[in-house]
């Protein structure tokens, strides 16, 4: 069985333009949402997801063979191509979800509250390898990210938490990892790495197994419960960070 595990590495406090990068990325997503909701009827007629994405990109990005209909390139100059495509994908998903909810609302004769298209978003950029993310020297607690400094996109050296990096080097060295995603928790920034691995499931009969369930909550961060197959609870732990939740 293939499972995916993830681990967040804290970015140590330093003078790097993380906030500016996050702001321009979210602004790009908001702008694209406004565009795609206007032309959704046209895009929705394209059944193939890849072709729909290509059509959406052609609307906003000019190349030698394509002239964009909207001024995305002017508003967000020199945005790395992979980051632009990530923003496009997020915007398409947002508009598609809104249209689906709107159709369901109309079929119920508007008995509940009408769905709203929210332009403000909490999208987090993915730092694709080689073009947005580069590993530091072997054994060094650092990485290189392409960030927006308010004028241009430049490579910045980022210091990473030593304890987190030691854990990755010890437990995940040699494992296949995905491109890291920026994450913000409790006023701190992290790079979240995901790892794929093959595991062998236990052959213990289901009725004899003990499991750990994790419920992600709103008022508390998480509740972990150890229980038997018949529902008997053996232990429970509430995890709640007192600081402000992002």
PLM features: residue spans?
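Nucleic-acid substrate recognition interfaces
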Residues: 1-246
């Amino acid at each position: 069985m293939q499972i995916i595990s993830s681990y967040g590495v804290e970015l140590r406090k330093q003078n790097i333009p993380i906030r500016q990068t996050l702001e321009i990325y979210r602004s790009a997503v908001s702008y694209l949402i406004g565009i795609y909701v206007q032309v959704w009827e046209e895009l929705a007629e394209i059944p193939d997801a890849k072709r729909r994405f290509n059509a959406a990109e052609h609307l906003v990005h000019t190349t030698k063979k394509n002239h964009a209909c909207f001024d995305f390139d002017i508003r967000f100059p020199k945005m790395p191509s992979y980051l632009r495509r990530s923003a496009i994908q997020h915007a398409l998903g947002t508009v598609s979800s809104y249209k689906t909810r709107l159709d369901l609302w109309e079929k119920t004769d508007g008995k509940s509250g009408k769905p709203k298209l929210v332009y403000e978003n909490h999208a987090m950029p993915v730092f694709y390898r080689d073009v947005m993310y580069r590993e530091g020297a072997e054994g060094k607690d650092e990485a290189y990210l392409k960030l927006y400094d308010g004028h241009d996109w430049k490579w910045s050296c980022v210091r990473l938490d030593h304890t987190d990096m030691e854990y990755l080097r010890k437990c995940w060295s040699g494992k296949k990892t995905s491109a890291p995603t920026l994450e913000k928790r409790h006023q701190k920034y992290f790079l979240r790495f995901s790892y794929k691995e093959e595991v062998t499931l236990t052959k213990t009969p289901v009725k004899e197994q003990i499991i750990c369930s994790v419920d992600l909550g709103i008022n508390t961060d998480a509740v972990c419960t150890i229980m038997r197959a018949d529902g008997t609870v053996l232990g429970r732990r509430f995890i709640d960070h007192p600081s402000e939740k992002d």
